[in-house]
C-alpha cells in the first residue's frame, strides 16, 4: 500500500521544477518539501495535504478547488510556518533553486586552463572559430620581459575560477607580427568576443604594483566588465552562506 502511494507521489511530481510565476514557485516549494521529507517523519495526513497543495487541479473542478482552498488555509499555514523544521528545508530548497539556475546559465564550452598558442595561424583560428558567446583573453608575452611571467601565472589562476572564459597566451615572436610587439609594449592583453577585439591593454603590467597577483588582474578586468559572474563551487555548506542567500 505504502509502495503504491509512493509511486503515485513520484508520478505526480515527476520532472524538474519549471514554474516561474508566484503560484508556480509556491507549488515548487511544496513539492520540494514533500520530496525532501523522510517518509516516517511526516504524518500521512500532512503528506496528503502537501501532495494536494502542490498538485495542479482541473479548471472544471471549481467547486472542489474552492473548498480545498478554504480547507487548506489553516493547515497550510501550520505546515509552512513550522519555524525550525521548515527553515532547514527552505534553505535546501533555495540552494536547489540556485543550483538549477546556475546550471541553466552555465551553458557553453568550459576551459579551465591557459592555452599556449604556437603560431599566428593558431591565434587567428582561435579568435575566428570560437563560439560567439565565449570571451577570449590573450596574453602576448616574451620570456624575460618584466610582468610577463606574473601575468601568465595570474591567468592560470583566473582560468580555474572562470572556466567559461578562454584564456590564452602566445609569444610575441610567434604571432607573425613580432615587430609590432616590442618588449616595451609587453605584456599586451587582448580581449575578444564574437571574433571582435573588445579591449586591448598594452604594457598592462604598468597598471599593477611591481609584485601583482591574480586578484589584482581579476579586479582590473572586472573594472572593464570583461569577466562573467564567478563560478559558485559549493552552494551553502554553512549556515553563514545560507544566511547570505536570504
UniProtKB/Swiss-Prot annotation:
This is Phosducin. Residues 1-246 form the Phosducin domain. Residues 111-246 are annotated as: Thioredoxin fold. The lineage of its organism: Eukaryota, Metazoa, Chordata, Craniata, Vertebrata. GO terms for biological process: regulation of G protein-coupled receptor signaling pathway; visual perception. Keywords: Cell projection, Cilium, Cytoplasm, Nucleus, Phosphoprotein, Sensory transduction, Vision. It comes from the Eukaryota. Light-induced changes in cyclic nucleotide levels modulate the phosphorylation of this protein by cAMP kinase. Belongs to the phosducin family. Residues 1-14 have a biased composition (Acidic residues). CDD domains: Phd_like_Phd. Its main location: cytoplasm. Inhibits the transcriptional activation activity of the cone-rod homeobox CRX. May participate in the regulation of visual phototransduction or in the integration of photoreceptor metabolism. It is found in: Cytoplasm, Cytosol; Nucleus; Cell projection, Cilium, Photoreceptor outer segment; Photoreceptor inner segment. It comes from Rattus norvegicus. SUPFAM superfamilies: Thioredoxin-like (SSF52833). Signal peptide: none annotated. The keyword Phosphoprotein applies. Disulfide bonds: none annotated. The keyword Cytoplasm applies. Residues 58-69 have a biased composition (Basic and acidic residues).
Amino acid at each position: 500500500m505504502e509502495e503504491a502511494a509512493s509511486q503515485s507521489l513520484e508520478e505526480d511530481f515527476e520532472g524538474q521544477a519549471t514554474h516561474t510565476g508566484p503560484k508556480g514557485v509556491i507549488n515548487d516549494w511544496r513539492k520540494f518539501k514533500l520530496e525532501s521529507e523522510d517518509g516516517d517523519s511526516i504524518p500521512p495526513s500532512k503528506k496528503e495535504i502537501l501532495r494536494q497543495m502542490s498538485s495542479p487541479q482541473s479548471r472544471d473542478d471549481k467547486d472542489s478547488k474552492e473548498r480545498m482552498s478554504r480547507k487548506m488555509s489553516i493547515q497550510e499555514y501550520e505546515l509552512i510556518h513550522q519555524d525550525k523544521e521548515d527553515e532547514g528545508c527552505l534553505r535546501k530548497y533555495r540552494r536547489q533553486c540556485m543550483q538549477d539556475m546556475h546550471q541553466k546559465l552555465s551553458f557553453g564550452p568550459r576551459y579551465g586552463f591557459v592555452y599556449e598558442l604556437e603560431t599566428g595561424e593558431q591565434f587567428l583560428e582561435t579568435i575566428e572559430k570560437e563560439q560567439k558567446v565565449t570571451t577570449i583573453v590573450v596574453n602576448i608575452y616574451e620570456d624575460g620581459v618584466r610582468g610577463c611571467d606574473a601575468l601568465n601565472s595570474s591567468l592560470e589562476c583566473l582560468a580555474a575560477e572562470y572556466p567559461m572564459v578562454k584564456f590564452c597566451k602566445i609569444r610575441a615572436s610567434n604571432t607573425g607580427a613580432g615587430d609590432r610587439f616590442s618588449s616595451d609594449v609587453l605584456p599586451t592583453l587582448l580581449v575578444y568576443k564574437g571574433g571582435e577585439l573588445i579591449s586591448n591593454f598594452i604594457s598592462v603590467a604598468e597598471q599593477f604594483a611591481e609584485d601583482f597577483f591574480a586578484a589584482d588582474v581579476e579586479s582590473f578586468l572586472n573594472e572593464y566588465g570583461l569577466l562573467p559572474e564567478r563560478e559558485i563551487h559549493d552552494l551553502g555548506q554553512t549556515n553563514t552562506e545560507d544566511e547570505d542567500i536570504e
